[in-house]
Amino acid sequence: PCTATPRVVDDLIVVSCGSSSGAAASVAFGLAPLAIGSDTGGSVRIPAAWNDLVGLKTTSGRISLQGVLPLCARFDTVGPLCRSVEDAALALAALEGSKPVDLTNATLEGRRFAICDTSAFDDIREAPLVAFNTAVDRLRRMGAVVERVKIPEAQAALALSGVLFASEAYGTWKDQIEANPDAMFSEILLRFRSGAQVSAADYVAAWLELDRLREAYYAETVSYDAVLMPSSPILPPNVVRLGQD
């Protein structure tokens, strides 16, 4: 990083995650009532989780990306980081120019949630897993029905990210990257450059497969109100160690 790395509000020796780290820190430290971030692979959700905030990753295409610096345009989204669900609902309405959802009489009674069994649970650390299970128990006590389901399409889609994310990101930024590669953090540079190795045929095939998986995933989950997953499998890393590793 070229400037200071934002820290987590209740532990100043660990990082706030990215890429919306400054957005999360500004709300967590009381500098702003809400913030807006971009999320392609977790950049709103994880900083929000690590700072005890609500982060909303909106559906791709729901909010205009005009004026947003792109990473992977077909996956990029914009969403708010707030202190409460109510604030997130108000921010979403403002972003899309709609009427806010009325949460006055909102209830979890009878709502159906699915926990998607994927490899996300294989390597999760104890503390995030305990927090996730505690949240699930709370939902059940409030009347929600929570079921574990196997959705292989989710895991299969994740495997495509190395092809689609890397090729889109490198295709967008290759001229700037190769003009001054030393300006980019080495590990991030390697991730971007991996997109140069993806053939056009593999890129198209990955998109066709993702479209198929999306349809199958929708069919598996359409009967549920939401799918529940941990926001992050790990706790925030130490800022010094992160810069050295």
Predicted regions span which residues?
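Short, high-confidence coil segments that cap the C-terminus of an alpha-helix
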Residues: 32, 224-225
